[in-house]
Regions:
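Carbohydrate-binding surfaces of carbohydrate-active enzymes
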Residues: 1-204, 223
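Aromatic-lined ligand-binding clefts that engage carbohydrates, nucleic acids, or primary amines
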Residues: 98-113, 221-244, 251-252
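Functionally critical, mid-to-C-terminal surface segments that flank or help form catalytic/ligand
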Residues: 84-85, 206-230
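Residues that flank catalytic or metal-binding motifs in active/ligand-binding sites
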Residues: 88, 108, 217, 237, ...
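Conserved small/polar residues in nucleotide/adenosyl-binding loops
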Residues: 262-267
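Short strand-edge motifs at loop-to-beta-strand transitions and within beta-strands
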Residues: 127-131, 219, 258-260
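A short acidic/small-residue loop/turn micro-motif
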Residues: 120-127, 249-257
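Preference for bulky hydrophobic residues occupying beta-strand positions
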Residues: 90, 144, 219-221, 231, ...
Length: 267
């Protein structure tokens, strides 16, 4: 689900009435025997926030918590975590040309890194489980960052564990082996955890290869009076948004929701 209550409802997420609401009033009026309908409240005041830039970043790989060590893969729940993201880390054997990484299964969205460089993603929605990885030296660091995107709460898929649910295998030179010897980092989605991160001046949101740098980005802006507004993240990728410590919602470049609705207090 998107972070929104606007499922084509008669009243929008921001509290404004829609044409559907007007049609409903017209229909109901036919059966009210001339009784007067209640007055529609005025729209909630909105404000415009001038464009602002993010000035600080806490890179993910420089701000990891203490890991847990495990020989084999386990789910997020088995590491006492119910939501957020989780990072699985191990080392790779020497890969002369290329190899195929198979993750069974990543719930729900996995980003793959080798020695800190983004290689690709595995999206559960699309049934993606395999990724080709390039040649690398023995001991190269493999990171699999898995985000839990919400739980299925009906039907046969209700048993919906998060993280990597079974195993990770590498097909290298015609031989398939299960990767073992993992360090596991719990990355819970709690604002208290973000406050302790080490931020540094933001020079670019992309690395030398043009890939977005995973991490926590921070900006400061001021409003003169309280009001409702929408924060536009159309040029960003995938992540979570907090304002003054309050979780506003998820953003994702694929849509359908390019903006996040929020109420701002003067500060």
């Amino acid at each position: 689900d998107v972070t929104s209550y606007d499922y084509d409802a008669p009243i929008s997420e921001s509290g404004k009435i829609t044409p559907k609401y007007e049609k409903l009033r017209e229909t109901l009026a036919k059966y009210m025997d001339g009784k007067k309908q209640a007055k529609v409240p005025d729209d909630i005041p909105t404000i415009s926030v001038p464009a602002f830039e993010f000035t600080e970043v806490a890179p993910l790989f420089a701000n990891l918590p203490e890991p847990k060590s495990d020989d084999t893969i386990r789910t997020m729940e088995e590491y006492d975590q119910g939501f957020g993201s989780i990072l699985y880390r191990t080392t790779l054997p020497k890969i002369d040309r290329s190899a195929t990484l198979t993750v069974t299964e990543a719930h729900d969205y996995a980003q793959i890194f080798i020695d800190g460089k983004y290689i690709g993603k595995l999206d559960r929605r699309n049934g993606e489980k395999q990724l080709d990885i390039p040649a690398c030296a023995e001991g190269a660091q493999l990171d699999i960052l898995v985000e839990a995107m919400g739980r299925i709460n009906f039907g046969r898929a209700i048993k919906d564990f998060k993280g990597i649910t079974e195993k990770v295998e590498l097909k290298n030179g015609g031989r398939t082996t299960e990767l073992k010897g993992w360090k596991v980092y719990n990355l819970e989605d709690r604002y208290e955890g973000y406050k302790g991160l080490k931020f540094e001046p933001l020079k670019s949101v992309k690395d030398a290869q043009g890939q977005r740098v995973p991490g926590c980005y921070r900006a400061t802006f001021h409003v003169e009076k309280p009001g409702d507004t929408f924060l536009n993240f159309e040029t960003w990728g995938k992540g979570l948004v907090y304002v003054n410590g309050y979780g506003i919602g998820r953003i994702w470049e694929i849509g359908p929701q390019p903006v996040s609705y929020t109420h701002l207090r003067a500060h």
